[in-house]
């Protein structure tokens, strides 16, 4: 890392180079079927955006073997998903269909399946696909043959151990981090989605082997968590950082707080690997978002993390103006590769989505920035003060490095995809063996954050420990209980059905 870059503004990617000229070994996971999954008419989440991203990458020439290794992921098996999620929740996801859901009202309520997280055709296969890609990417990083691994279909950070949330069913991020922890003593998770990364934070709230850092809109906004006072609990105290932001934050303001905080985190925590969730709903003009980042400002976070030369996993996340999402993730793939891409988009099968400007760059608007310099400075000082109290995570026994082989293609003759075995990944557990000690010790306390009571946050003399603040648990009737905005923009481009594009009336960026 170049320390002098820590104070640079969010528009520095406007220069003709990516700053760090050193090439990185990059692998990219993509399943051609992912764009076919469809949440339903009018739903903001559209997996088709991943297919649009892939098309841009292809026409920019970034899929060539000389640029990066392109891999089709193996679907995650049920037992793999259960490394984090509960058995009954995974069994429900596997069994439920649009036709059978009407008879399972109690289970739907129990697992938080509804308007935000609907049942749709191929739901379980969709979860297997994006989770398998994230875990496969983590395996590649553990092998040491790649410096950066990318899965734009992943990053679904709201899913909990036993429930869906915020368009997310399976938390592929937690599964990927558990994989990385097999080799790395400490893993850093950074979230630049506009929504708080609550599912990942909750999963690792009581451990010091994972540090979570979330930059998000805070207030009457989904999911309603992510208070700056939420700092972790027990062994995880001070290993959880929340950076609450207000509407309209622009590139320069964002980088003025992102770079100093992350620089200090990297100095104090010294992670063996970094997971960066690149939710694109923090871009200007997002259908559900209220930030004002340009595409270059968003990508500056990727560029900055790349400069540390630590194994880096790039994941997708939110993003609901899909022409912006595709351009953002294409641009960030170029940043990961150290490739400068021309501004004018090459002609591709989705070219009409990107008019009238047909530019790779997502521009910021003139919306008001409600984040004052004073507010940002106070937040930064608070976070840096918490970081000053850090102690390095204790050493753990390292596993022997896994020998590198090609990730095998799925066996199409095997009828049940949940029984396919990936010999390249030690992530796949034997059905008849108990979960390994390291995974068990990390996940047995998952859910502790939710169960912390006021009496548990008092010391032995009865004095309340206000530093161990527990953020609000949003109820169904709360303002922030649904991720879907009540209004949308008539100019937003959306997908009506898989592979069938049209303009969706009644949807607009805030």
Swiss-Prot record:
GO CC term (a single one): nucleus
InterPro entries: HDAC_PDAC (IPR050284), His_deacetylse (IPR000286), His_deacetylse_1 (IPR003084), His_deacetylse_dom (IPR023801), His_deacetylse_dom_sf (IPR037138), Ureohydrolase_dom_sf (IPR023696)
Catalytic activity: N(6)-acetyl-L-lysyl-[histone] + H2O = L-lysyl-[histone] + acetate
Residue ranges of the region described as Histone deacetylase: 24-338
Active site: 158
Basic and acidic residues bias spans: 418-434, 448-472
Tissue expression profile of the protein: Expressed in roots.
Enzyme Commission no: 3.5.1.98
Top-rank taxon, per record: Eukaryota
Binding note for cofactor: Binds 1 zinc ion per subunit.
Residues that coordinate or bind Zn(2+): 193, 195, 281
Record site: Polarizes the scissile carbonyl of the substrate: 320
Biological process according to GO: epigenetic regulation of gene expression
Comp. bias regions, Low complexity: 485-503
A single MF term (Gene Ontology): histone deacetylase activity
Pfam families recorded: Hist_deacetyl (PF00850)
Miscellaneous: Plants silencing HDAC3 exhibit reduced peduncle elongation and fertility.
Function: Responsible for the deacetylation of lysine residues on the N-terminal part of the core histones (H2A, H2B, H3 and H4). Histone deacetylation gives a tag for epigenetic repression and plays an important role in transcriptional regulation, cell cycle progression and developmental events. Histone deacetylases act via the formation of large multiprotein complexes.
Family per record: Belongs to the histone deacetylase family. HD Type 1 subfamily.
Protein's UniProt name: Histone deacetylase 3
Annotated organism of origin: Oryza sativa subsp. japonica
């Amino acid at each position: 890392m170049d320390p002098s870059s820590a104070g640079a503004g969010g528009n520095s990617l406007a220069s003709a180079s990516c700053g760090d000229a050193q090439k990185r070994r990059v692998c990219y996971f993509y399943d051609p079927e992912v764009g076919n999954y469809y949440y339903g008419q009018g739903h903001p989440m559209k997996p088709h955006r991943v297919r649009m991203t892939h098309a841009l990458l292809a026409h920019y020439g970034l899929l060539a073997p000389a640029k990066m290794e392109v891999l089709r992921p193996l679907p995650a098996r049920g037992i793999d998903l259960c490394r984090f999620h509960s058995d009954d929740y995974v069994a429900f996801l596997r069994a439920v269909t649009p036709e059978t859901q009407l008879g399972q009202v109690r289970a739907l309520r129990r697992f938080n399946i509804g308007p935000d997280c609907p049942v749709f055709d191929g739901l379980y296969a969709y979860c297997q696909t994006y989770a398998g890609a994230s875990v496969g990417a983590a395996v590649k990083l553990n092998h040491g043959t790649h410096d950066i691994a990318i899965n734009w279909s992943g990053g679904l950070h709201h899913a909990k151990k036993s429930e869906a949330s915020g368009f997310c069913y399976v938390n592929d991020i937690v599964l990927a981090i558990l994989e990385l922890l097999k080799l790395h003593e400490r893993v850093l998770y950074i979230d630049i989605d506009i929504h708080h990364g609550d599912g990942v934070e909750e999963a690792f709230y009581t451990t010091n082997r994972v540090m979570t850092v979330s930059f998000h809109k805070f207030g009457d906004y989904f999911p309603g968590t992510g208070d700056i006072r939420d700092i972790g609990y027990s062994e995880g105290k001070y290993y959880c950082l929340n950076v609450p932001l207000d509407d309209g934050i622009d590139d320069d303001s964002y980088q003025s707080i992102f770079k100093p905080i992350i620089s200090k985190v990297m100095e104090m925590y010294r992670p063996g690997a970094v997971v960066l969730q690149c939710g694109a709903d923090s871009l200007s003009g997002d259908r559900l978002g209220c930030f004002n980042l340009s595409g270059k400002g968003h990508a500056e976070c990727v560029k900055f993390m790349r400069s540390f030369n630590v194994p880096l996993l790039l994941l997708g996340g939110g993003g609901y103006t899909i022409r912006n999402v595709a351009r953002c993730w294409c641009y960030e793939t170029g940043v990961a590769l150290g490739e400068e891409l021309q501004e004018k988009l090459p002609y591709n099968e989705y070219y009409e989505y990107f008019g009238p400007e047909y530019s790779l760059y997502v521009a910021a608007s003139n919306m008001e920035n409600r984040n004052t310099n004073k507010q940002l400075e106070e937040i930064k000082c608070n976070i840096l003060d918490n970081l000053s109290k850090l102690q390095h995570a204790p050493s753990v026994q390292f596993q022997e490095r896994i020998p590198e082989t090609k990730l095998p293609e799925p066996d199409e003759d095997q009828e049940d995809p949940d029984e396919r075995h990936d010999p390249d990944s030690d992530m796949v557990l034997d059905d008849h063996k108990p979960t390994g000690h390291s995974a068990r010790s990390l996940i047995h306390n998952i859910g502790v954050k939710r169960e912390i009571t006021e009496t548990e946050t008092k010391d032995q003399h009865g004095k309340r420990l206000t530093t161990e603040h527990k953020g609000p648990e949003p109820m169904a009737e709360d303002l922030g209980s649904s991720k879907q905005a009540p209004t949308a923009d008539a100019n937003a481009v959306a997908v009506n059905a898989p592979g069938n594009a049209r303009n969706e009336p009644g949807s607009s960026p805030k």
